[in-house]
Amino acid sequence: IPRFLGALLDYYKDPAALSADTAFTLLDAIRYLPQQYYGEKTRGALIEFAAYFVAQGELRLTIAALEFLREAQRSLPKGHPQMGRIVAIVRSMQPEALTAIFLKYKILSRAGVKDPALEQTLYHMDITSEVFLDNLKTATPWIVKVAGVELLRDQVEHGLDAHILHIAAHFSNLVKVSERVVVRHTAGDALVRTLSLLRRDQRNEVVVELGKGLEMGQYEISKYIPQYLGQAALYLHPSELDEQVLWLRGLLASPSDSAVSGALNTIGVLLENYPAYLERFPQPYSAFEHRRQELLGLLLQGLAHYREAVRQEALLVIGKLLFESRELSLGEKSRLFALCYRKLLFLILESADQSRLTFFYRAAALAHINRFIALHRLDHGPFSFPPPRKIAFFPGTFDPFTLSHKGIVQAIRDLGFEVYLAVDEFSWSKKAQPHLIRRQIVNLSVAGDFHVHLFPDDIPVNIANPDDLHRLSQLFPDQELYIVAGSDVVANASCYKAPPRPWSIHGMNHVIFRRAGEKPLPKKLPIT
């Protein structure tokens, strides 16, 4: 490091010989140079380097120099000689730009020096529209825009809330349209910090407006939105948040891969920051947990998608934003893992046909999950999973799979069953549709429903064959196994009319649902 530092500091010896672009790069670089690697003498030389460009008057260089001087102040006590030199430098300047005035005021305030004229300009005059105008100009340097965002945020934090909604909307626009990544990130952070100060209706308006950037489906616009849309949505009241979740569900059906990718990333950020929502908006834990499961289910739907690009993005989000997250505690990750580990395993294996790129996406996601599992086992020992549920087996899943069929599956699941759906290879009594397409339709339909799974394709089960039923029962040892069938099947299928044999269908537990139009039973029959 000393050799590198010495080579770098050689460039700061003659500021007059530098071009404007080189000087700006050097000024911006020293802000991020760790101060423990150089002493007071070097710091003094860098302060004089910045002083030269403060005096030059070019706004871009002035702002960069002031940002460094502000950073250098952080490690200096008020009585330090270098602190006095910094104060002398900024007092000698006569800035006209509001961003330069703002930085001058901040530097003097940190040094304990009051300047009523600067305070009058910043906090007793309406300067918001002028900052808006500068921030939206293409010709404005990005470092000036960053300082402008900080100025607007400072205005709000000082209680100047006359334009607070317009300021939040301005931050939202910068996240969507700014050509500089650093401006987008600065505006996004400022937006999230500002939302808590808005009224309920204002928060909803800003979040909805920010979400419109995802609907456009343009990657250049939507790339950085999810990181802040996900955090911002968690400042909405529960009813408005549920509307946002419903909107994201609809966006997952978009024909644009960019829009779907943005929706998946937003859902990932929502899940990553979701634990804080319960403290922000107290509510019944059941409602809080139901919303978490719904969000996780939407991610799993992405894994079951028929478009490969969507499956790739879902793998990335699950691996990186959930199991590699620095925001989620190990306990939160464990709860998510216990809920979805079966779904993850099945959905990853179900889409066996893959491109080379998908192979690497899958490898990266599994590496993140494996790292989480290893850390959990080291710190907390083996996983603790809920006790096994009763098994409900659909021997021939409906074709085509409709919402009413899905409702039957969910009703049985809600009775405490783990539901397995088997898709027939071919049945003359059903629609003659290719088997893999039928299986994919069912898979996509139930991907987001927990405790509902497709039965493995390589284990054929014929309910008329006692050997198949015996093997099926052996797949679920120490668990109650139920066959699910419609009342018309029980009344008319040949296997039920055949004489009973060992392990025939007659000796199996059943869950029977009544077909529409049939007479109701004289009394309800219990599940035994």
Regions found by a protein language model. Give the residues of each.
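Short sequence/structural elements of tandem HEAT/ARM alpha-solenoid repeats
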Residues: 3-6, 39-48, 78-85, 126-127, ...
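Residue-level signature of the C-terminal ends
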Residues: 4-7, 11, 15, 29-40, ...
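Extended amphipathic alpha-helical coiled-coil/heptad-repeat regions
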Residues: 123, 150, 160-163, 171-243, ...
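Conserved hydrophobic register position within alpha-solenoid helical repeats
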Residues: 1, 22, 26, 46, ...
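Generic N-terminal leader segments that precede the first folded domain
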Residues: 59, 63, 90-99, 103, ...
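Nucleotidyltransferase catalytic core that binds NTPs
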Residues: 226, 264, 268, 274-528
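Alpha-helix N-cap/helix-start positions at coil->helix boundaries
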Residues: 17-20, 59, 95, 111-112, ...
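Alpha-solenoid HEAT/Armadillo-like helical repeat scaffolds in large eukaryotic proteins
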Residues: 7-15, 49-56, 88-93, 101-108, ...
